[in-house]
Amino acid sequence: MGYAEMAHLRGLRADFDEQANAPSANPRYVTRTTTVEKEWWQSLPLRDQMLVRGAGVSRDSRKAILLGRWAAVQHGMWIGPFTDWTVDVALPSGKPPAKSKWPYLTRFRSVPVRDDETITAHNIRYTDRLRTYIDLFRFGTITDQLTATDWLLSHYSRRTVHDYIDGFEGCRPEILKRAHRMVAGVTPLPEYRYSLARAVLSSHRIDCYPVFLKPWVTSGPLIVDCGGMRNIAIIIDDATGSDSDFGFPEDTRASWTSHHNFPTVRWDFSDLFFRPDLFMREVGRARNAVIYKHSLPKWEW
């Protein structure tokens, strides 16, 4: 994670600290007791709204610690598509209160959290990076696990992650084995948008592989194998719709796919995060069209 991303997360938590329960003519409840300015909330991207929602739940409780996806967004860690607003938390002791005392849309997990695994920033408590990664295998989805692995391997060596998993206590062995296999087997992608697209495709058992337009700097399109040397290319636009990041000319990925004569599915990152089902529907249509085309005699193409 770069300095700009770290500064953005710190600034967002500081903004929430100022906004929380400040007098407002148009408040928006992020928890049952915490409000922010509605216009400010609506201006935030969905992942930032998740950070604010988790921060509100942590503030409302004297001891609750954010877990899994909700701790991941506090770190800027990559996660799978949005699921719901139910926040996962735990108490340090691991003993949840009676369900009648749970705040609205909050789920207490029966897992202890040590002091050395807890980070506190602006009165927000959440687990550290490596503990968060393990919790994604306990409570997260396969897309959470795949994208978080890409992110984690850009911050830690494989050996460091394997050693942490080996030393982790209080978790079922099969969960730790799954984490080991994923860390060992993933080729990390350097961009969240392509990491997320690959994770969504993999969760639907669709094989794909990345093209690196420049080694170790940025990934090109994802290539989906339709069988028999037939392929389609996936291009995910960033938040600005531009393809010129990392110093590449505008639309380099589209030029690459055009040069290789691949049919292309182009999708927006924010839509992929919020509605992956629509993305998969479009990929399915493109695959079927390619397979149908190649089932015809060549003079009918």
Roles of regions detected by a PLM:
Residues M1-C171, N288-W301:
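Short gly/ser-rich loop at a beta-strand->alpha-helix junction or flexible surface loop bordering the NTP-binding
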Residues S154-W301:
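Surface segments flanking catalytic/ligand-binding clefts of nucleic-acid enzymes
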